[in-house]
């Protein structure tokens, strides 16, 4: 997410938004001020809590990118769209069904990302010479150490605290477009986090991108 002004934020809903900012070098941090943001436990979902949206770029391996003839392509970057299924990329949706043994019944090239995701297929569109993937991390205040149960004050921003987020690993590709749908914060985690909560002290959070 990006700061729109001092009082509220808005999602970076486009891959080509000009206000994506670069990450700090390893061992260094970038800082951003955000307002206090606390809520009751039932309201701890992705439209209310404060989070960070990360954009990554990648180039698929040619040997793992399958064309319409069932063979690996020479250069994945000549294609504007790729489909990802079961750890391989495909140049068309038809190739996903034919060579990836995916169930593509009812799907077309015009199907939405949500319709594709329902069958474990992810669409990636090239921009800026590479393909992009996105990750959301929702900032925790009090971790209950249970990834499936929402805790009281688990997600939120409380005044007089510094929240430090450190990305420690990336486990899997995220979606091909920014994920802005309403979800509970306690959902499948894209980031594994270790952090401490102390007043007026940096709250360290190590994050694994999944």
Regions found by a protein language model. Name each.
Residues 4-159, 209:
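Tryptophan-paired
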Residues 154, 159, 175-210:
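C-terminal functional modules
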Residues 159-165:
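Short Pro-Gly-centered flexible turn/kink motifs
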Residues 172:
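Short Gly/Pro-enriched loop/turn and capping motifs at secondary-structure junctions
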């Amino acid at each position: 997410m990006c700061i729109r002004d001092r009082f509220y934020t808005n999602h970076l809903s486009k891959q080509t938004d000009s206000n994506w900012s670069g990450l700090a070098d390893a061992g260094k941090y970038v800082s951003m001020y955000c307002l206090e943001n606390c809520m009751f436990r039932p309201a701890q979902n992705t439209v209310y809590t404060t989070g960070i949206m990360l954009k990554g770029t990648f180039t698929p391996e040619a040997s793992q990118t399958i064309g319409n003839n069932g063979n690996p392509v020479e250069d994945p970057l000549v294609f504007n769209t790729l489909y990802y299924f079961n750890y391989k990329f495909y140049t068309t949706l038809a190739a996903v069904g034919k060579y990836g043994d995916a169930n593509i019944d009812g799907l077309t090239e015009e199907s939405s990302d949500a319709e594709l995701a329902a069958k474990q297929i992810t669409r990636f569109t090239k921009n800026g010479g590479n393909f992009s993937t996105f990750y959301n991390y929702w900032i925790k205040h009090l971790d209950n150490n249970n990834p499936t149960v929402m805790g009281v004050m688990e997600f939120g921003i409380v005044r007089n605290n510094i929240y430090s987020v450190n990305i420690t690993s990336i486990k899997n590709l995220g979606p091909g477009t920014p994920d802005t749908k309403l979800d509970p914060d306690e959902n499948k985690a894209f980031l594994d986090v270790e952090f401490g909560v102390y007043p007026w002290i940096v709250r360290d959070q190590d994050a694994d991108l999944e």
